[in-house]
Amino acid sequence: MFIAWYWIVLIALVVVGYFLHLKRYCRAFRQDRDALLEARNKYLNSTREETAEKVE
């Protein structure tokens, strides 16, 4: 079965575009996750300090 050259080019462009989209999306997701984790850690540390002050 003959596949026209433009179908091969189209499939290659879709694959490359999908790869670049995933790369960008994963980077943004990682930055969001790191920011949320940092905020959570700050909150937990401040809560621990307040609890330690109340106990003393």
UniProtKB/Swiss-Prot annotation:
Keywords: Cell inner membrane, Cell membrane, Membrane, Transmembrane, Transmembrane helix. It is a single-pass membrane protein. The chain crosses the membrane at residues 2-22. Its main location: membrane. GO terms for cellular component: plasma membrane. Induction: Expressed approximately equally in exponential and stationary phases (at protein level). This is Protein YqiD. It comes from Escherichia coli (strain K12). The gene is yqiD.
